[in-house]
């Protein structure tokens, strides 16, 4: 086996998905702790303690205790090299999360065991279904009072339509949480309270019938034996093939805050989750074992380092090996670029990448030429598909407090729209600037970032826009006629793409009927 294949086989690239507040950022912290990347994990709540969670690294996230942007972290675990993408749990940032899920080979789904399956989890699972992404499940918060574990698994099976195979099973919960039984290893791992910031050196008791178990946990031992008979009869056995097809999920129980059960998940991901997978392009499927380099950009982040006022494009490597100083072909603009300063990430800590392999995420410095969805190759004219921009659902007019700063405002808005967090539209026949977003929180984020990063103070005003659609036509004459007749509803987005800005849904439907040769698109790929 070649050294290249060994490197590809080692990679595990996954994202964590959950409903807000299910404990996703805490799990990210603990996963890093096991990867020896952090000696003492920061907690998300109690932000005044100064020990902020490592993956929530933008100022605004630190203030609010929510993850707004996708963080990327790489760390070794056992014989694997893990690339973990932490996605925003907050609802308004679903586009960012959606695009992140195009860059991973498996997902860890985190569920709050007191609440069960929640709305956001359902939506995210629909996205993973599009590519049959394998899912590992973690039932979190066992150190609190929880719902019945069998009931929780039934809910996952019925609502998310995926079979559950328990790998670990909880013994007690809340103040009486004693630990878990590992079904595949036939061993009980005991929980120690108050070890949330360090790796627990847990006591392990081999075998359900071991008398040591009765000594250690008293009557819970017999309850566990009785329960296991029921569980084994009522649940699925783990089946690797079904897992890889996205039909079955291994289920682990634990508490991220108490740092218990996280290593069990990591063991499962390293053992079962797939190596980097082939990727679809407009020409063919690209295999990870191909020698020529290729990759696509799924995210752009401005001002990762306020000291440098920079923008970084996050690229998933799909095939070949990145080497410092190599020449890449930027397919959309048809230019070759030399890349000598790509970055690897430890959540905001950036290091220069010496080399990168399929499954790795590298950062390219972006001076305004790279867009979300762009493909880079070693010359081949192919384009990876499936990294969309979505039409926003909410709109506001944005206005300056100081009219002399129009230039800075436009620059800031265009850069923020390149990140895909919001979209900016410039109407063809007015000087207005319209901001479009998926949710209200995004509007707040934009005003705050304009102020802190671009020194521009802006306010919003209501505007009668119901929706926007990107417009195209194969018939250039018909497009010109459409532009002439509908100019008061047309705008250019941040990438200068023609967009129809509809005041009402009725107006949009009438226009679509009136102009059958014009395509009104809800999504757009670069």
Curated annotation (Swiss-Prot):
Domain of life: Bacteria
Residues reported in the UniProt entry to bind GTP: 18-25, 86-90, 140-143
A Pfam family hit: RF3_C
Location of the tr-type G domain: 9-277
Annotated GO MF terms: GTP binding; GTPase activity; guanosine tetraphosphate binding; translation release factor activity, codon nonspecific; translation release factor activity, codon specific
Any GO BP annotation: regulation of translational termination
Keyword Nucleotide-binding recorded: yes
Keyword terms: Cytoplasm, GTP-binding, Nucleotide-binding, Protein biosynthesis
Record localization: Cytoplasm
Principal location listed in the UniProt entry: cytoplasm
GO cellular component, one term: cytosol
SUPFAM superfamilies hit by this protein: EF-G C-terminal domain-like, P-loop containing nucleoside triphosphate hydrolases, Translation proteins
Function: Increases the formation of ribosomal termination complexes and stimulates activities of RF-1 and RF-2. It binds guanine nucleotides and has strong preference for UGA stop codons. It may interact directly with the ribosome. The stimulation of RF-1 and RF-2 is significantly reduced by GTP and GDP, but not by GMP.
Entry similarity comment: Belongs to the TRAFAC class translation factor GTPase superfamily. Classic translation factor GTPase family. PrfC subfamily.
PANTHER family for the chain: PEPTIDE CHAIN RELEASE FACTOR RF3
The protein's name: Peptide chain release factor 3
Organism: Shewanella loihica (strain ATCC BAA-1088 / PV-4)
């Amino acid at each position: 086996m070649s050294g290249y294949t060994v490197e590809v086989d080692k990679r595990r690239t996954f994202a964590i998905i959950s409903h807000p507040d299910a404990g996703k950022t805490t799990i990210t912290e603990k996963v890093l702790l096991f990867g020896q990347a952090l000696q003492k994990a920061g907690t998300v709540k109690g932000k005044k303690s100064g020990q902020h969670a490592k993956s929530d690294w933008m100022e605004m996230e630190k203030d609010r205790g929510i993850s707004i942007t996708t963080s990327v972290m790489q760390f070794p675990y056992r014989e694997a090299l893990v690339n973990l993408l932490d996605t925003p749990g907050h609802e308004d940032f679903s586009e960012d999360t959606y695009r992140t899920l195009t860059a991973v080979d498996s997902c860890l789904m985190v569920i709050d065991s007191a609440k069960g399956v929640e709305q956001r989890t359902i939506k995210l699972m629909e996205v993973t279904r599009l590519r049959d992404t394998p899912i590992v499940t973690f039932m979190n918060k066992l150190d609190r009072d929880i719902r019945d574990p069998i009931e929780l698994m039934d809910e996952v099976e019925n609502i998310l339509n995926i079979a559950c195979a328990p790998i670990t099973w909880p013994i007690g919960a809340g103040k009486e949480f004693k630990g878990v039984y590992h079904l595949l290893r036939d061993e009980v791992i005991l929980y120690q309270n108050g070890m949330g910031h360090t790796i627990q050196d847990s006591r392990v008791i081999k075998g359900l019938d071991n008398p040591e178990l009765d000594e250690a946990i008293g009557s819970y031992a017999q309850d566990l034996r009785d329960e296991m008979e029921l569980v084994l009869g009522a649940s699925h056995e783990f089946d690797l093939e079904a897992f890889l097809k996205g039909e079955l999920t291994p289920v682990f129980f634990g508490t991220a805050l108490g740092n218990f059960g996280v290593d069990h998940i990591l063991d499962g991901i390293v053992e079962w989750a797939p190596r980097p997978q082939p990727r679809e392009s407009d020409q063919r499927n690209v295999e990870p074992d191909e020698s020529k380099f290729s990759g696509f950009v799924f995210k752009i982040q401005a001002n990762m380092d306020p000291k440098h006022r920079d923008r970084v494009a996050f690229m998933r490597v799909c095939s070949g090996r990145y080497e410092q100083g190599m020449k890449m072909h930027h397919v959309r603009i048809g230019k070759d670029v030399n890349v000598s300063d790509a970055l690897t990430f430890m959540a905001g800590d950036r290091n220069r990448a010496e080399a990168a392999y399929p499954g790795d995420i590298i950062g390219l410095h972006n001076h305004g030429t790279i867009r979300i969805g762009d493909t880079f190759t070693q010359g081949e004219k192919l384009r990876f598909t499936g990294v969309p921009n979505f039409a926003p659902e909410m709109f506001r007019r944005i206005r300056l407090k100081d009219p002399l700063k129009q230039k800075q405002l436009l620059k800031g808005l265009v850069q923020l729209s390149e990140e895909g967090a919001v979209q900016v539209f410039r109407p063809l026949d007015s000087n207005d600037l319209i901001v479009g977003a998926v949710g209200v929180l995004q509007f707040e984020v934009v005003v705050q970032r304009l102020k802190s990063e671009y020194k521009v103070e802006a306010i919003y005003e209501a505007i009668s826009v119901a929706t926007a659609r990107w417009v195209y036509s194969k018939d250039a004459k018909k497009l010109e006629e459409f532009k002439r007749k509908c100019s008061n509803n047309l705008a250019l987005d941040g990438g200068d793409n023609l967009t129809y800005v509809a005041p009402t849904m009725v107006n949009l439907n009438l226009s679509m009927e009136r102009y059958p040769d014009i395509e009104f698109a809800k999504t757009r790929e670069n």
